[in-house]
A protein has these predicted regions:
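Hydrophobic alpha-helical membrane-insertion segments
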Residues: 83-95, 164-188
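Membrane-interfacial helical/loop segments at transmembrane boundaries in membrane proteins
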Residues: 1-4, 103-121, 182-218
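Ferredoxin-type iron-sulfur electron-transfer modules and their immediate structural context
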Residues: 191-193, 220, 234-357, 405
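Alpha-helical membrane-embedded segments
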Residues: 18-27, 133-137, 169-171, 216-253
Length: 676
């Protein structure tokens, strides 16, 4: 845009840079006091390792809009609009440096930045882009405030901030076009006078009788209007959710690079406070999450707890924590030992919502700005259990059983080896040199329905002539339920006991049928020094099938809808192997659970310790998932997890369809297809 003339005797560039300096001063003051100072109250955290990997991810997430666009393949095209606005905004930011600030200092375009041809091309691009963005902004307004999809229907997502920003950006686009138009109308020449839309409008204004003097005045008005909007935007950002434009790239850089399924390790010996009960107990990355949050509602819209009528809203957890931090910000210092504790679980975040979380990771998967909700929620759950001894009664019963019996199945009548009766399965005590440890797990060993899964696995291993053994009575719970229910202390006791036992037998390779055991041993035992090669059965059996070690031959005539376990799929990226096993079964027709499959799979309701925590609000999560299964019209829902088998079977039974539909582990169907 061609700048107007000087302001009387005052050179234009002086006015521009004085106003810019003032706006930047206000921005930096607010940014420090409303963001930096508050975030630095948090505890130190990792995030400075593997810089190239971090930078690559941050660029893809922020500049590339990777997570925003990932939903397009599922038919959600809102991300295209957001990415267009974002990339357009970046383009205009570049143009401000060239056309507004640098040009105002020279009274014309600084030729050393671009050649005349470059200016012409770039001006045409900005002219067309301004029109495109104006259309996209109208669509964004209609979508958010008229059509209003479910994820944008919250008071938080309909806040006036978003409307103000849309109006400001629209003002930038219109003022760009009109500045060009009135430059043409006053007889201006050069590359900026040749832009398509601006030239057409300028000629139209001339035809309407707008004179050179009026056009000159209006060109100055819209040029200054454009600059004013830029300055207002600069000052306004630190006070709104649009701080995420600056916080999101930083947040993405410092995202966790640890396995998705691993909760952060707690050093019990050197930790004064267990979990997080006030702002200062969180890490600075967890506090930064609140500023990175775009309040888009994607996390809450994906949350199975929220979708079934529970209190939990991941978006509100993050935003309420940030708002609480800002509200008490006048007390905050980097080392605030003197600050009176202000509990976040008293009126800020409800305890019920903390216990609603299933640890399924759907919120993290959907978040476009690398907010990590689950560790934050789990730190509050740890605080409730370890600092305040608070938990639902059903959770307390399971934790007590874990502590007393080494498993959560209170009241079971089975021993660790009853499931193997008649199968002649050796223990490591009997066969210490076995190549593979088959980790049975509490549920397949001690819960009647799930014992069929363990038996199927043993039959398949024998058919493939795998050199394996089990721990038998030496096996105890991996500790996953304890950790997911907030008792980190009990988790570490159980985990260390298992690590010591396996190291005593020099175990190298572990195969398990339970994704929760798999995730814990693979991703969390290394935190305690337990380093083993851990495979889920689907990975191991898929290899056996490909090598020809087992050959399914019996026709099964089953139409199976496959349900992805959260701890196998989202947390560990194991999607293809279970499907590979299913496809190898003769006569099995595999179908997907609509759009709720793979990384967008819907939790069965058992994660986060909820296998043993009773649901008291809304629809049961497993019933909602059962409804999704029934929509496929398959006769069987296939899973790769003993928890999922139980939850889906109960859902089918609750709907009175257990004579028509069934829930089975893929492993069971595979075993039935073998000639044993």
């Amino acid at each position: 845009m061609v700048p107007p003339g000087d302001i009387g005797a005052l050179p234009l560039w002086v006015g521009v840079f004085v106003l810019l300096g003032l706006a930047l001063a206000i921005f930096h003051y607010a940014f420090y006091h409303r963001v930096v100072r508050l975030v630095l109250q948090g505890k130190k955290t990792a995030g400075f390792d593997r810089p190239l990997e971090r930078l690559k991810g941050a660029l893809l997430i922020s500049l590339g809009q990777q997570k925003v666009l990932q939903r397009v393949k599922y038919g959600d095209y809102a991300g295209i609009g957001h990415a267009t606005i974002f990339w357009g905004f970046l383009t205009f930011m570049l143009s401000y440096g060239i056309f507004v600030f640098a040009a105002s200092a020279k009274g014309g375009f600084p030729e050393w930045l671009l050649t005349e041809t470059g200016v012409r091309v770039y001006s045409q691009y900005l002219d067309i882009l301004a029109a495109v963005l104006a259309v996209v902004l109208v669509w964004a307004f209609v979508r958010r405030w008229v059509l209003t999809p479910s994820r944008l229907a919250f008071d938080l997502t309909r806040h006036s901030d978003a409307l103000i920003i849309v109006v400001l950006i629209m003002g930038l686009m219109l003022s760009t076009i009109l500045t060009h138009a009135f430059w043409v109308a006053q007889g201006g020449t050069g590359p900026e006078a040749d832009v398509f839309i601006g030239k057409a409008l300028g000629e139209l204004f001339t035809d309407w009788g707008i004179g050179v003097s009026a056009a000159n005045t209006l060109q100055g008005v819209f040029w200054w209007s454009h600059l004013s909007i830029i300055l207002i935007f600069t000052v306004y950002i630190p006070f709104t959710k649009h701080m995420h434009m600056f916080a999101a790239p930083v947040n993405a850089y410092f995202r966790s690079l640890e396995p998705k399924g691993a909760l952060p390790f707690m050093d019990l010996e050197n930790t004064e406070k267990f979990g997080a009960g006030r702002v200062q107990d969180f890490t600075w990355k967890q506090l930064l999450d609140g500023y990175a949050c775009a309040v888009c509602g994607r996390c809450t819209d994906a949350c199975p707890a929220n979708l079934t009528g529970k209190q939990l809203s991941p978006m509100h957890i993050v935003e309420n924590l940030k708002d609480h931090m800002v509200a008490i910000g006048h007390q905050g210092e980097r080392n605030p030992e003197h600050v009176e504790p202000l509990p976040i679980l008293e009126g800020v975040i409800s305890e019920t919502s903390i216990w609603d979380c299933l640890n399924c990771g759907a919120c993290i998967e959907e978040c476009p700005v690398a907010v990590e909700h689950v560790p934050t929620i789990m730190d509050m759950r740890r605080h409730l259990v370890l600092e305040e001894s608070k938990a639902p009664e059903s959770a307390m019963n399971a934790l007590l059983s874990l502590e007393q019996r080494g498993h959560p199945w209170r009241g079971t009548q089975y021993s660790r080896t009853d499931w193997a009766e008649g199968l002649e399965v050796p223990t490591l005590a009997e066969k210490p040199d076995a190549e593979v440890l088959f980790w049975v797990g509490c549920t397949p060993a001690l819960e009647q329905r799930s014992q069929a899964i363990a038996r199927s696995m043993a039959k398949i291993l024998k058919a493939a002539k795998v050199d394996f053994a089990i721990l038998g009575d030496e096996e105890t719970c991996t500790g996953d339920p304890a950790r997911r229910m907030g008792n980190e202390y009990l988790f570490q006791i159980l985990a260390q006991q298992n690590i010591d036992t396996m190291n005593g037998y020099n175990v190298k390779k572990v195969v398990t049928t339970c994704p929760h055991c798999f995730n814990t041993m693979k991703n969390e035992y290394p935190q305690l020094g337990g380093k083993f090669e851990v495979l889920h059965y689907s990975q191991f059996v898929d290899q056996l099938i490909k090598k020809g070690s087992i050959k399914p031959v019996k026709m099964m005539n089953v139409t199976m809808a496959y349900h992805d376990s959260c701890f196998l799929g989202r947390h560990n990226g194991v999607y293809d192997e279970p499907r590979g096993v299913a496809k190898a079964i003769p006569g099995l027709k595999l179908v997907e659970m609509g759009s709720r499959c793979r990384e967008r799979g819907f939790c069965c309701g058992a994660g986060g310790g909820h296998m043993w925590i009773e649901e008291s609000q809304g629809t049961r999560v497993n019933h909602a998932r059962t409804d999704q299964f029934l929509e496929t019209e398959a006769d069987t829902v296939g899973v790769s997890c003993p928890f999922c088998v139980q939850m889906m079977a109960e859902g089918i039974q609750a709907k009175g369809l257990d004579s028509e539909k069934e829930a089975k582990d893929v492993l069971e169907i595979l075993a039935d297809s073998l000639e044993l």
